[in-house]
Amino acid sequence: MSTIGNNASSIGNTPILGSVPSNIAAAPPTTTTTTTTTTTTTTTTPTTTTPTTTTTTTNTLNTMIASTTPLSTTPTNVPIKPPLLINQFGKPLPNLSSTASSPRTPIKPFIGTPNNPSTPSSLIALSSPIGGGGVGSTPFSNQFIGYSGGGGGSSSSSNNSTIAYNGSTPYKPVLTGSGGIGGGGSGSSTPNRGRFSGKTSNIGGGGGLNNLNVGGGVGVIVGGIGNGSSNSGVGGTTTYQASQLVVTNISKGTTTKRSFPIPTNITPPKCPLPNWFTSLDNIHQVEINNLPEFFQDDNENGNGNGNGSGSGSNNMTEIDYDEIDEDEYSYVDSVEYKYIKKKQKLQLSNKELYKIYRDYMITSYQKNPYQYLSVTDVKNHFINQNKKTFKVNIRSIIKIFDFLEYWDLINCFVNSGDYMNIISPGVFNYCNEFYQSFYRKKFKHEEREKEEKERLEREEKERLEREEKQEKEEKERLEKEEKERLEREEKQEKEEKEEKEEKEENEEKEEKEEKEKEEKEEKEKQEKEDDKEKQENENEQEKIEKKENKNDSQNKEIKENHDKKDETTDSNNTTTTTTTTTTTSTNTLVAESSSSSSTETDDNDKEMKEQPVQENKDKEMMETDTTKENNGVETTETTNQTTDSIETDKEMKDQPIINLEKEKSSEDKEINDDHNENEKQDKDKENEKEKEDKTENGNEKENEKENEKENEKENEKENENEKENENEKENENKKEKEKENKKENENENEKVDEKIEIDKEGINEDEKMDEEKEEKINNKKEDEEVESEIKKDKLKENEEVEGEIEGENDEGEVVEEDEDEEMEIEEDEEDEEDEKSKEPKKLTTTKSANDQLIKKKKPLFECKKCKADCSNVRYQLVNNSTALDGNILPEYFYPMIICVNCFSSGNYENFIQSSSFQRIEQHQPEEFGWTDIETLLLLEGIEIFRDNWQEISDYIGGSKTPEQCLTHFIRLPIEDEFLERKISSFPVGSLSKKEIDSNNPFSITYGVNNPIMSLVAFFSSYSQPPLGLLASKAAKVILEILNDPKYQQPSKEELERIQKEKDDKEKEDKEKELKEKESKEKELKEKDDKEKEKEKELKEREDKEKEEDKEAKDKVDKEKEEDKQKQDKEKEEDKEKQEKDKEEDKDKEKEENKEDKEKEGTDKEGKDKEDKEIKEDKEKEEKDKEAIGDHDKSDSTNTTTTKEMEIEKQDSSTSTNKETVEMNQDDHVKIDEKETKENDKKSITEEENQQKDDNDNNNNSHNHNKEIEKDDNKENENEKEKENENKNEKQIENENEKEKDLNNLSESQSSNDQSKSNEQMSSDNQESKENSESNSNTQITSKEQNITTDQSEKPKETPTTTTPATLPATPISESNTTTTNTIVDKENNNETNKTNENNSNNNNTNEENKTAESNNMETVVENNEKKPVDNDDNNNNNNNSNDKMDVDNKNNNNNNNVDKNEKDKDEENEMEEVEEEENDLNDEKKENGVDGVGEEDDDEDVEMETASVDIRKSTTTTTKTSLLMMSPPPPKKSRIPEPNPEYFSEAAIQAATAAAFETIQNESKKYYELEEQEIRDLIRSIVICQIRKLELLWKFYVTYEQSLEKEKDYYEKITKSHLQ
């Protein structure tokens, strides 16, 4: 097998794992030597030969254990490899699906010359001669043009054996002979039947290879013999009928020197990405899906039929496989064709064979994952093992072989994160390009088809659901509209009724007011008329007096001027004119005065009545009155003038001027007559108009009343019709509701299934809800507009009606009506504005950049607990799931959706099982589009939030996921110009020559094609940061953004709105904090209340217990009384029996007295003896009673034993008395009557006294036992609590001190002297235990004694110091060794036991106990004098030990041997543990004393003392300490050069921003809305992001290098373990 691998790597096929091309500097490999024979390989030129060494280079990173392969069902425990970070797609990478075979890489065409194979343009230089190569078939490729004979086989020339090797596969090397005649090539046949390999003289096509110079022909099923013996072979032609490709005229035996790439496999149709192969059945299912040809037994056809021509003859005919019966025949595919007829054995199916081959391949790969397995090896394996009847189908083996390798390729390069562990970085650059295109081209189309199908299905479902929802919504909307319409109509009706009622009330009020006004006006008119008459009379008298005075003056003047007649005539003519003017002027003045007085009265009326309409009417009426009055005054004046003129005429009859006066009077009359006629005409006209107005107003009022009546009738009819319609609609609604209820009952079972679909359509529902809201808002607006129009129409109608009523001439009223209309319209507008303000306002201001350009997507699914987005992966509660109790969960828990974090942390109800949740993965398609503003926001978010990608995605607007943000940030270009340059042109800096010349993959000269490494090397070697580069890059980005007219700065209104939102959030946060504080305070109060309630409950329990104790005592007393009563009854019965017996005895005695008198002498002696015995018994009983009383006072612990003894003695005494009576009866002693009576009385009194004493003793003992039991229970509870507290404290201290103790124990060595002294101490303790057992029955009042130890009995070398765990520790003395308090306690016990021995020997007298107490007190004084430290502690410990001794003595008095044995065992185990721990502590303290005790601080001493107590319970071994003491190796420094810290300084960033700002100012002379500081901030963010990117790359490679080093260490350990 080793020769095959070496030849394969040199022939020019794809490289095996571990082999690296010559033009790539691989990582320093570790070599493993194998002893094999040397072979020679030929290159392009046949003359040159290079001998290959036996050492094969393999990469240690690729060595794997067989159990780590994922194909193994039960892998063993192997250390976990450190994973890598991310792949080129930006997602976390899974592990390899299969490492069973080595990955193969595609090879690019050869570009250089064949003689120069080390050119860097290609991985492998292929210069092998290619002749007439055979054409083979593989499961995934229609043809395969092999190198150096490809599909053709070969045979060995030395032995002329019949073994023929099949052709190569796409990923396995070609097998060729070393010389001689080549075997026949393999053709293709049906997949159900085996292939046939040719022989040199039998079947086959052209010959094989001979020394790699000449190619062979194409093999067929029935072909000629190939001429392979010479240096030229004859090739045949093939035609593929079944396949798509047609290959003809394969090149014949001429040699050609050219290179040809290995073609890649064609992917199978609908090939999904592979998953982890958990089991063989899982693999088999994937194989069935991806190998349909192999598992179709009926309709399978071969890839093609070849016809080869050769110079040989045909010795074999073609066989029809369909004619062979599977029941009769089974065959073995070997070199020679042998058909064996066996009827009993059946032929296996293809699937079974495939499983067998597959299992064999997998097991072989598990044993050695990187071994080379050829098809012939598998075939021969089955032939050798199953020689009887087995079908070896070579085609199936090839399918398995290629199938496994195909999936390994995809897993390694598309779905894997460990590709760098398998392939070197140079190879990966080529493979990455190929497999990216491979993945995108081959699987994108199929994925799109699937997505389109799924999309169409979803759209159909969504469409159907939408239609259903729309129908439902329309029904609901119609119902709502009808309801709203009915409500509106009802409201309108109510409003109309209210308006009508108000109008009627107003009209009634107006009529009443008008009547009152008219009455008032009539009264006022009468008063005015009376006043006017008085004034007129007074005026007339004044006028008469004036006229008389005038006439006198006129007469005088006439007399004086009688001579001047002519002049007087002229003067009289002028005076007449003046008088007329004066009269008119006086009339006007009177009218004005009257009008002014009337206006004043009218103003007073206005103030009283407060109605503008009536005031105007009053004004008009008063004006008409004033005009009439003025006319009346004028008429009176004219009449007075006429009377005056008549009187003057009478007086002037005798005078000569009479004629002149007549003429004047005539003229005046004419003038007055004309004036009066005009006034009369005006009055007539005014009266006519008033009459017309009154008639019109009356008619209008009548018409209005008629119209109102008609309207009321119409409204009543309409209301009746509406009520009928409403009743009909209600009936219809009831029917519809009944139908809906039925439907709802039917759909209740379907709701659970619909909920899941509704969750998937969350986005559509949200959009629909938004649309519905908008529609509702629009509908409301339309309704409001309609209502406003209706109101306006009504107002107009009302205005017209009021105008007709009030009249057109009333100008003041018309003005006020217009004002009322305007007020009503304004009120309606205000109501509309209020309703609009209640609705959600639509912002008219310009939105910010985030709001305008980015719409935040609502999540499809939200976590029910933490409200996080769980649309990609979520856990949903399954329907009809059960709780922990077994009960089904109620319906209100569904649907419960939880995110991954809540599920893993258990953030859900405690009674719900985790198995009742179902994991649902719904990965959304990645959105590749990124706008410029989204990138800018991403950069700003990185500057603000740094590594928190969730907040960065929220800052962008939620349109991108955190994973998409990270991938886009990594894909952003840093600076492409500098990658085009050569790295050699840059200064190297601080790097040494060794790093440059070495093969280190992380050096500058290594991996030129890796852009990331070149960038890291470039920036690390720079002495100063490249500020110009960063500035120019930032300037370009910002100019592109600023010059785009789309992007504008947000307005001030939006900024104010944002600030308001922030303020609101702050207020909300404060409110939340206050609420939280209040809730906490409430919780504290509740806790306090609960504690108080608990205390009350405890008190109640205690009271109940006391009451129960009292009841128990009462019961005991009752029982005692009952016992006494029973005893009394028994005594009475006994007395009666005795009396009867006595009477009988008396009768017998009388009869026998005669006989007994003779024997009296002999019986008197017997009587005397019996009397003496009775007296002795009584004396003993009295002594016993006295002893019992003393015993009860001395020791309470032995009450139980004394009771038993007393009861036995009492029983014995009673029995003796009874026996004596019986003996007397049996012996028939003759006693006198007096003596018998006396004896009977004595016996009765004695029995009564004894029973009383027994009852008293029993009661005392019973009460005493109860008290003892209570004390014991209390002591046990206290001891348990103390032990639990000590255990908890010791566990905490042990954890902290184990490390120190273990380190000290590993360095310490135990001393022989101390071990001997400890052994002596342990032996003394054991002796003391034995002594304590012997003295278990002794009675000691240990509660009153304080037992201590004499220092003289202790060893001199070991002074004692006590450090109990519960008390504070004391510093260590200068002595080398210490002992613990437990030993002191046990030595005290030993001394107590010795004193007990002495007391037992002296019959337990009280005097000896007192002496023991005095001796013990002396020992306490001595110890206290010699122990100045911790006296209180010792006393406490002694008291505790004495309490324990009391319990031991009580248990020992009960003589329980079983408890003794158990205690002995426990004590022995404890002593052994203590001895071991003391030895360790002594060793530690010796070392501390030698190294320097004085240098340690007090804190360290305290820690050592606490450790000495806690280590007693921990049993450690030296093996554990040896492992823990192994110190880890020091961390290695990274080989990557660290970046220059000046590059990350603040000065560098500021310089870069200033340079970029200058370039922007120079290049663009426009005016931007942004300010200078804002532009500088943008530049700064871009520069920092670029720096941040480099920093992340450096960290990535540092972690990557550390992972490689860890893997190297890991594999070195594995190799060492295998070698060992």
Swiss-Prot record:
One CC-aspect GO term: nucleus
Matches recorded under Pfam families: SWIRM (PF04433)
Biased segments, Basic and acidic residues type: 450-497, 512-568, 606-628, 647-798, 1051-1195, 1219-1255, 1264-1302
Ranges of Acidic residues composition bias in the record: 498-511, 799-834, 1467-1481, 1493-1504
Region (Disordered): 1-57, 176-204, 294-318, 450-849, 1049-1506
Domain SWIRM: 310-421
Domain SANT: start-end pairs: 925-977
Positions with biased composition (Polar residues): 1-13, 1338-1350
Skewed-composition ranges (Low complexity): 28-57, 570-598, 629-645, 1303-1325, 1358-1382, 1390-1416
CDD domains in alphabetical order: SANT
Domain of life of the organism encoding this protein: Eukaryota
Keywords recorded for this protein, A-Z: Nucleus
Subcellular location: Nucleus
InterPro entries in the record: Homeodomain-like_sf, SANT/Myb, SANT_dom, SWIRM, WH-like_DNA-bd_sf
Bias (Gly residues): 177-187
Transmembrane spans: none
Main location: nucleus
Name used for this protein in its record: Myb-like protein X
Originating species: Dictyostelium discoideum (Social amoeba)
Gene name for this UniProt entry: mybX
